[in-house]
Amino acid sequence: MKQDITLAPMTAADLPLLAGWMAQPHWHEWWAADVETELGYLRDMLGGRDSTRPFLFSLDGRPVGYIQVWRVADARVEPWLTEAPWVMDLPDDAVGVDLSIGPAGSLSQDIGSRALAAFVSMLRAEGYRTIVIDPDPANARAIRAYEKAGFRPIPLLRGRTPGCLLMQHHDRPLADG
C-alpha cells in the first residue's frame, strides 16, 4: 500500500530537523555548503529576504525530506549568473526546484519522485508552466527519481555550466526510447 505524501511550508521550528539532515553524508554530498551556511539561507527564505519558498514533505505524517521552489528571474544576478548562466535562456516565469531526502533510511524508496510529482502538481495549480531542476550529472539516484516524476534532460543550452544536467518537467511522460 502506498503511503501518503504531504507538503507543508517550512517554518523556523523546522530548522533543527533540517540541521540534522544536512549533517548526514548523503545530503552533504550534493548540497555543498556547510550546515550553518545552509541554515542562514533558510532563515533568509523564512524571513522574506529570499524569494525561494521552502517546504518539507512528509510520508504518512513523518517528515522525510526538503523541497524548495525558486524563481528563475530572481536568479539572474551574481553569483548565480556565473554559476548557472543558463537561467538567461529560460522564460521569465520559469521556476526551479531542488530537493533532498532527509533520513538516509528513506533513500531509494520512490519517496523523492513521489514528493516531486506532488510538488509539481502544486506548482502547476499555481500557474507555473516551465519547471526545471538541475541535478549534478553524477547523481544517478536523483536523476532516476526526477525522470520518474516526469522530468527530462533538455538540449544543451548556450553557456550551460559543467556539472549541471538541466531537466524540465513534461506534463505527459515521454515514451522511453
Where are these regions (language model features)?
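A short, well-structured alpha-helix characteristic of acyl/acetyltransferase catalytic modules
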Residues: 1-4, 9-44, 64, 173-177
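Short, P/G- and charge-enriched loop/turn segments at secondary-structure junctions
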Residues: 41-44, 81-88, 154-155
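Short loop/turn motifs at secondary-structure junctions and domain boundaries
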Residues: 45-49
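Conserved beta-strand in the GNAT
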Residues: 56, 62-71, 96
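Conserved acyl-donor/pantetheine-binding loop and adjacent beta-alpha core of acyl/acetyltransferases
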Residues: 71-99, 105-107
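Conserved catalytic-core motifs of GNAT/GCN5-like acyltransferases
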Residues: 73-74, 134, 147, 152-166
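Conserved acetyl-CoA-binding loop-helix of GNAT-fold acetyltransferases
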Residues: 108-125, 144-148
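Conserved beta-strand-loop-alpha-helix junction that forms the acyl-donor binding cleft
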Residues: 124, 133-143, 159-163, 170
